[in-house]
Regions:
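One-carbon transfer enzymes
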Residues: 1-255
Length: 255
């Protein structure tokens, strides 16, 4: 398999790999995630999935196994890791390639203007990043997704991307928003001594975790929980929750 560019579609390979929910409020519903599938109605949705770490890989697995169709995956560019500092793919990219899904890895999805004091080196880097963003946006438009699902992707999405899917973008966030917006919500909940946390499925806006919440799934934090143990439990809840949310969305129940 030829090596993928950081901004193009990675060819399929046998190698390893919003809608308008109800606004968040004190009365936002909390749900218990069931192993039983939601009542199915409406056609399967075309999904673009954006995520990077292990937490996001579990939800991708659930979507691949659902009745909905994942048409492409966005993940951050391969990063150097280990003693040899070899470039390694993200957990999400590995899952995507194992499922023969195309992968996009732009450094950014924002088109950045030139700065007044821009050096030649920065100009070259900016133009390369802008080209990657333009190619990724063109590929996403061509896919005509119904919805984008985002989980710990690590890049902010500009409004042009949020507006691209027919039904908008849904985010899987591992906290009971608005508490612990942003990065590392699992660790922050444990460090603060919270008695409970959870997973929110929310409509994405241009701000950081500021969109309206469609579903809240409460998870108690046990005395024996470490960040790793709680991470795995929340990843399982998030995976089930997003499949249920897409079933509701396709049936017109998530409005």
């Amino acid at each position: 398999m030829s090596a993928p560019s950081d901004h193009g579609l990675t060819p399929s390979s046998p190698a390893p790999q919003s809608c308008s929910p109800t606004p968040a409020s004190a009365s936002s519903p909390s749900h218990t995630v069931s192993d039983q599938p939601a009542a199915q109605a409406g056609r399967p949705l075309r999904v673009v999935y954006a995520g990077t770490p292990v937490f996001a890989a579990q939800a991708l697995d659930a979507l691949i196994g659902s009745r909905h169709k994942v048409v492409a995956v966005l993940s951050q560019p391969d990063r150097p890791a280990g003693r040899g500092q070899k470039l390694l793919p993200s957990a999400v990219k590995q899952r995507a390639l194992a499922a023969n899904l195309p992968v996009l890895q732009p450094e950014s999805l924002r088109i950045r203007p030139a700065a007044a004091d821009e050096t030649e080196e920065r100009r070259v880097r900016r133009e390369a990043a802008n080209q990657g963003a333009e190619e990724a946006l063109a590929a996403l438009r061509a896919l005509q997704p119904d919805v984008m699902v985002v989980a710990a992707y690590g890049l902010l999405l500009p409004q042009s991307v949020l507006d691209l899917p027919r039904l908008g973008c849904l985010n899987i966030h591992a906290s009971l928003l608005p508490r612990w917006r942003g990065a590392a919500p699992i660790q922050r909940a444990i460090e603060a001594g919270d008695a409970e946390t959870g997973v929110c499925i929310m409509q994405m806006e241009a701000g950081l975790d500021t969109g309206p919440v469609g579903a809240r799934h409460v998870v108690p934090i046990l005395e024996t929980d470490t960040a790793s143990i709680l991470h795995d439990r929340l990843a399982d809840v998030g995976a089930k929750a997003i499949v249920a949310a897409l079933d509701d969305l396709s049936a017109g129940r998530l409005v």
